């Protein structure tokens, strides 16, 4: 599913929304950088941004905006999100997911599917949710994840209201609970997993997560990063061969001039931006988990 654009050339000059399937262990900014560099490889400069950060250990739908469409990213932020989650019972972790070691092991063999479904049903509706310590939320001018790295814990973290529209437990396999959730903007699925474990009295953490939808946009309509790169380069190649591809030609000429003037300084700035954003992403900046 792609946004409409006004260009009649191969490369949409007004920009577009790209629906991508984020791979495991990639940060959201890894994806943005890859697409941005693809345009650059084709000789075009394009703004590229994304809506709704996914943690490195999550996969699924990541919506990118290019060109003028980056100004419309805010229109996507408030959309509900759907996830498929795997929750492991019988242990907790400091980050509420697989990023930190298991602690507080508790036997969970007595927990039945009916018990989990009953507990999950109680979560449906509006509720207050505290951000996890391993998150980019602020406390007295400092990121929570920065405090967590120092071994500090803020007990009274500012909670915000979220809505869990649906919490469907599909099946269990040993200590693993498989479920589908539809939640409002800003919901941390890993916090829901931790709270479910507490409600069952055995502890739990998020063992796997895949985002399947953002509002009306679905992962079934998404492309892989490599397919998106191939499509962009193909569009640029077609545009180069068209008499009407004047805009792209001017962009390429301007791009080469700017690159020549900027030289290594631009390269260094880009590398620094990638490094900084990777650190932020891996610390769950604006994470929806």
Curated annotation (Swiss-Prot):
It is an enzyme of class 5 (isomerase). Pfam families: TruB_C_2, TruB_N. The keyword Transmembrane helix does not apply. It catalyses: uridine(55) in tRNA = pseudouridine(55) in tRNA. GO terms for biological process: mRNA pseudouridine synthesis; tRNA pseudouridine synthesis. Residues 265-289 have a biased composition (Basic and acidic residues). Residues 243-289 are annotated as: Disordered. The keyword Isomerase applies. Its EC number is 5.4.99.25. This is tRNA pseudouridine synthase B. The gene is truB.
């Amino acid at each position: 599913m792609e946004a409409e654009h006004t260009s009649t050339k191969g490369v949409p000059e007004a920009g577009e929304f790209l629906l991508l399937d984020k791979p495991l262990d990639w940060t959201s900014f890894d994806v943005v950088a890859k697409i941005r560099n693809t345009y650059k490889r084709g000789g075009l400069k394009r703004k590229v941004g994304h809506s709704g950060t996914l943690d490195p250990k999550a996969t699924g739908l990541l919506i990118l905006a290019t060109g003028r469409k980056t100004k419309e990213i805010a229109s996507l932020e408030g959309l509900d999100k759907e996830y498929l989650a795997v929750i492991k019972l019988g242990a907790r972790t400091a980050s509420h997911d697989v990023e930190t070691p298991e602690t507080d092991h508790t036997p969970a063999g007595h927990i039945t599917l009916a018990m989990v479904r009953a507990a999950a049903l109680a979560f449906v509706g509006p509720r207050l949710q505290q951000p996890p310590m391993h998150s980019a939320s602020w406390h007295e001018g400092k990121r929570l994840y920065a405090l967590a790295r120092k071994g500090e814990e803020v007990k009274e973290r500012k909670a915000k209201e979220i809505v869990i529209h649906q919490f469907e437990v599909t099946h269990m396999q040993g200590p693993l609970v498989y479920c589908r959730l539809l939640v409002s903007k800003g919901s941390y699925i890993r916090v829901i997993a931790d709270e479910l474990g507490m409600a069952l009295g055995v502890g739990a953490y998020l063992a796997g997560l895949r985002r399947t939808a953002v509002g009306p946009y679905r992962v079934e309509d998404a492309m892989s990063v490599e397919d998106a790169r191939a499509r962009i380069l193909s569009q640029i190649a077609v545009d180069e061969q068209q008499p009407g591809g004047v805009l792209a030609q001017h962009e390429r000429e301007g791009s080469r001039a700017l690159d020549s003037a900027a030289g290594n300084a631009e390269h260094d700035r880009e590398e620094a931006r990638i490094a900084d954003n990777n650190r932020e992403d891996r610390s769950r900046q604006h994470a929806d988990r």
